[in-house]
Amino acid sequence: MPNPKRYATILSVTFGLFAIELAFSLVPTATLNFPSEGAAPGEFPQQWIHGSKSALDNTDPAVQVHRFNDHTYILRENKAINYEGAFMYVFFGNGVALLIDQGSTSSPALFPLRQVVDELIDAWETEFGQTSTHLIVANSHLHGDHYAAWNQFVDRPNTTMVGLTHEEVTNYWGFTNYP
């Protein structure tokens, strides 16, 4: 039987790749080459951190950052902060970054997702000679463990919030037949 967590990760990455390809098609100029022959290869970590049994004793970062490839990052919420251990994805392209999901914890003090994403954007821009990367914040689906830190991005400059309702999502992506 396939591993459901691995399947969910692969499904989320596939959705993200589709969404970012759609988002990048809206960008008129490109300086990086992103061939569209399929998903770019990358590597998963040997093991995800799990946090400590007690959040008081935890020494692991609140957000584990894994570089899947040059333009794709997989983030994981520390399970000592929230038992869900939510996964989030950041995809980079010409002038645009796409954040899929925002985890299970809203508090920036406990779960500084925006700070981590801002640092990733800054580092990626420096490495690839990009500036003013626009961030799109979207969700794979609307369970609370996927959008709790949404509030951290609402006032972020140069950011588009796709929305949390079915209508907002379908209007933004242009879906006409979406479940």
Residues of each region from the PLM?
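N-terminal Sec-pathway targeting helices
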Residues: P2-T14
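Hydrophobic membrane-insertion alpha-helices, especially the h-region
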Residues: S12-A23
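N-terminal low-complexity, Pro/Thr/Ser-rich intrinsically disordered segments
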Residues: L26-D60
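Short, solvent-exposed secondary-structure boundary motifs
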Residues: Q47-N58, Y73-N82, Y172-Y178
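Conserved beta-strand hairpin/beta-sheet module of binuclear metal-dependent hydrolase folds
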Residues: V63-A123
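Active-site HxH/HxHxD metal-binding segment of metal-dependent hydrolases
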Residues: P108-P179
